[in-house]
From Swiss-Prot:
Assigned keywords, A-Z: Cytoplasm, Lipopolysaccharide biosynthesis, Transferase
Pfam families registered for this protein in UniProt: DAHP_synth_1 (PF00793)
UniProt xrefs under HAMAP family: KDO8P_synth (MF_00056)
Principal subcellular localisation of the protein: cytoplasm
InterPro entries: Aldolase_TIM (IPR013785), DAHP1/KDSA (IPR006218), KDO8P_synthase (IPR006269)
Enzyme class per UniProt: transferase
Protein name: 2-dehydro-3-deoxyphosphooctonate aldolase
Top-level taxon of origin: Bacteria
Catalytic function, reaction form: D-arabinose 5-phosphate + phosphoenolpyruvate + H2O = 3-deoxy-alpha-D-manno-2-octulosonate-8-phosphate + phosphate
Family, per entry: Belongs to the KdsA family.
Naturally occurring in which organism (per UniProt): Actinobacillus pleuropneumoniae
């Protein structure tokens, strides 16, 4: 069965399941202005060299940290200043998450994509406020929700007048404190959303929690294998976090790619994407 492929425009980038993949990459949380500039510059250099469409990602507030003592970020006001400087300096589009209704309008005035966090994906008031900004929305699939249920969230956003939706898989609960990625789920999300672009958050899919700890562990030694598997499906994009020194990152370092490995990593992902999308589709439904 042929699946319709919708195109979502992000600046001059066309994001779609049958287009060359877009890299949504950056860092987990804004640690400082200088760190953000350094990371973004490296991503821009690599993606320009390889010819990969690119969107910078980072959070200004990690509002769902396990511990009240954990670093959350610089906050919305300072974060938006950093985002604007990145746009002015590098000409990048930007994606970031919102957690509160009041954040939607001011954030949407600066960034190009606002992200609906997985834990909040069914909160109707927040979904409605995000949708009414008119900007592109990236919906993280909740760890507790089946791929088929994502169609309901897309419909909710559409009912509020916004058709610019991207869906993102970031793993599914597998028992306690562990995640697994269902590779069949990507096509299910394509179908139930009537062709919305589907992307893969490989970084957060590698989380593995310490049941008694105050921070997430991770398995970055498996990031390449998992990302290769996802790219072989034929996706609209890959969501990736990198850090100059993952062991000292202020959030989710155990799942982050070392920044020094970025070019080799993205080069492999592009090779897989190019190959898969060169194939003629085989309809096995009949």
């Amino acid at each position: 069965m042929t699946i319709l492929n919708k195109i979502v425009k992000v600046g001059n980038i066309e994001v779609a399941n049958d287009k060359p993949f877009t890299l949504f990459g950056g860092m987990n949380v804004l640690e400082s202005r200088d760190m953000a500039m350094r990371v973004c510059e490296q991503y821009v250099e690599v993606t320009n060299k390889l010819g990969v469409p690119y969107v910078f990602k980072a959070s200004f507030d990690k509002a769902n940290r396990s511990s009240i003592h954990s670093y959350r970020g610089p906050g919305m006001e300072e974060g938006l200043k950093i985002f604007q400087e990145l746009k002015d300096t590098f000409g990048v589009s930007i994606i970031t998450d919102v957690h509160e209704i009041y954040q939607c309008k001011p954030v949407a005035e600066v960034v190009d994509i606002i992200q609906l966090p997985a834990f909040l994906a069914r909160q109707t008031d927040l979904v409605e406020a995000m949708a009414r900004t008119g900007v592109v929305i990236n919906v993280k699939k909740p760890q507790f929700l089946s791929p088929g249920q994502m169609g309901n969230i897309v419909e909710k956003i559409a009912e509020c007048g916004n058709e610019n939706v991207i869906l993102c898989d970031r793993g599914t609960n597998f028992g306690y404190d562990n995640l697994v990625v269902d590779m069949l789920g990507f096509n299910i999300m394509k179908k139930v959303s009537k062709g919305c672009p589907v992307i893969f958050d490989v970084t957060h899919s590698l989380q593995c929690r310490d049941p008694f700890g105050a921070a997430s562990g991770g398995r970055r030694d498996q990031v390449t294998e998992l990302a290769r598997s996802g790219m072989a499906i034929g996706l609209a994009g890959l969501f990736l976090e990198a850090h100059p020194d993952p062991n000292s990152a202020k959030c989710d370092g155990p799942s982050a790619l070392p920044l020094s490995k970025l070019e080799a990593f993205v080069s492999q992902m592009k090779a897989i994407d190019d190959l898969v999308k060169s194939f003629e589709e085989i309809d096995t439904s009949r």
